[in-house]
Amino acid sequence: MNGPPPASFPAFDVSKSERTDALTVVGLTVTYRIRGRDREVLHDISLRVRRGEAYGLVGESGCGKSTMAMATLRYLPRNGKVKAGKILIAGQDVQALDADALRTMRATAISMVYQDPGRALNPSMTIARQVAEAFEAAGATRSDALTRTLEMLRRVRIAAPERVMDSYPHQLSGGMQQRVVIAMALASNPALLILDEPTTGLDATVEAEVLDLVAQLRKELGTAVLFISHNLAVIGRMCERVGVLYAGKLVEEGATQDVFARPRHPYTVGLLRCLPTSGRSKTLERLDTIAGQLPAPGSITQGCIYADRCRLADDRCRRDAPPPHRVAAAHGDQMSRCHYHERAMELPRATADTPSPRASVGDAAPAQAAAPGTLVLRAERVSKTFHVSGVALKAVDDVSLDLATGETLGLVGESGSGKTTLAKLMLGLLSPDAGSILELDGMPLPARVTRRNDEQVKSLQIVFQNPDSALNRSHSVKRLIGRALSRLAALRGAAQDERLAALTAAVRLPNRYLGARTRQLSGGLKQRVAIARAFAGEPRVVVCDEPTSALDVSVQASILNLLADLQRERGTSYVFISHDLHVVRYLSDRIAVLYLGRLLEIGPAAAVFDGPHHPYTEALLSSAPALDAAPHGERIRLSGEVPSAAAPPSGCVFHTRCPRKLGAVCEQQDPPFIDAGDGHRIRCHIPIQDLRTLQCAPRNA
């Protein structure tokens, strides 16, 4: 975090707003016209963002965060309108501007960076043309715009900017695309920069680089930032103040340090407790969850809007809407819309979806369940080479690992490290190179899924990152799960109905959704349907490929609890892929670290996190934002991009980016695995004791 705001910053008090403030919002109410009636999605929002300040806006999907951004830009859809209130940007009333003045303001005073840079960039235009357009809109000539484009690309730390200027968006990595979008947004030196989930989906190292870049540019340009995110750790790292939105209302606001250390609204407490923070593990505790769902847009609620989900609520809460209470805090005033804000931290812990005692979806335990610790899957010297336009790309290079019954193996690494390719090889969706060995229960596993028998097919299943792409939108939930039971368990009629009922109960999917189409479901419910399908055939191994990356923290917690429960009940093994290291730490028993297709480290989750680490693992861990992280010097910054798999570095594949490189030995010799004890192995030339000493010393990068 960039330090506390001035103590004179009264929370929720816009009366002291000045014309020099980047953003002032007073009594903002926004409605959407839905099915013939206006439905409020934002209600009486007031906040201010001072010049140069970073203000975070958090809350679950549907709380109104993005609507707040669109209203600020006056980009609401046709069915949206500002019903009441005022929005001032650098002293200008946005709603009062005519078309020309609004265009000028968007070109000079305010910019926005969206979640998906691939959709924000025009695929048919070069990077130079797109960034130059932003400068031209702010008044620069074409030649001057191109000169300033090159300067800005350097400023946002893009390597080889001359080459990038002639590139098209699809030729750049996600992190590079986001840097280009930031360059475009800052072309006009705006008073206010709105960031809407700018790092969602990015690797930990790329996310850290983007956040560092935003912080540095803020410092250089004095730009204020409205940072919208469901990632509380990112907000904690980036923002001086934070506002918590729930169902269109600002329920808490204050200095980020105060709100996260001593939250005064039960909703904020619930969000913070959902996080799989450092040290939390499925073997020690279940994650807290927030029961229930957001009220529908436009719902008329008497009393507190959060009362139906709050475990502190009483008759007063259901009867009387709480006013904004102002409380003196360490770094300025704190606001809470809760009658019992002093007791918010006393909120009883909740781990909804408490596991039932049943052992399986059927009447008995799964017939194939093996003794705990029995080896279920083995991969030995597995490689995969793709041939693209005559060039060989080594996506997975000589990887050996195994998986025990009831165990979770986490796979981590940057994009392009080979995680998903390795998982597809296990599933038979890709054929490995000659010499690769795959075994299930000690028996050879055919390379292609089409050559596997029914028992092998149903033993290995997958849950994808995006359930929308995995589920047929035209089918009902009952039909989707029923088809899986028919194909994987050969069940029909009454037997299928009985198993379906047990399966939906196992994944905590209410019966009222069985007739619904998936397009009518929330993200969390869709993922429960996907999990139910994967478990239809009583699989031995389930590959979970980023299953929670697109979910809110509250929904993520319930899905992680569900996966842990199913594993505990059935002895299912997981291969769990994620770029969120804290999620991986919570669910995994062991962790494997991949880089450029090579296995660099593998061991028990606690050992991999506590160290000693491979220098690459060390960099990944230092990049991951955490609310409870104790500072230990500067973050490790990896230089450059991941090398191409078509021309991997000689020697250690990580030596071109390694901050602890020894010299020629790393450049010329492939390092062996060294034993760190208790099944923890690291592929590095640096001796274990030296790694331990180096990584315990304070960093001053």
Model feature map: region roles:
Residues 9-12, 19, 255-376, 605-701:
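Charged, flexible cofactor/metal-binding loops and thiol motifs
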Residues 60, 74, 198, 202-283, ...:
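P-loop NTP-binding/switch modules centered on Walker-like glycine-rich loops
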Residues 73, 77, 427:
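Helix-to-loop junction immediately C-terminal to a conserved catalytic motif
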Residues 94-111, 137, 258-263, 295-301, ...:
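ABC ATPase NBD coupling module
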Residues 144-163, 272, 495-512, 621-622:
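Conserved ABC ATPase "signature" region
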Residues 167-172, 176, 517-521, 525:
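Conserved ABC ATPase signature
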Residues 187-191, 536-540:
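A short, proline-enriched helix->beta-strand linker immediately N-terminal to the Walker B motif
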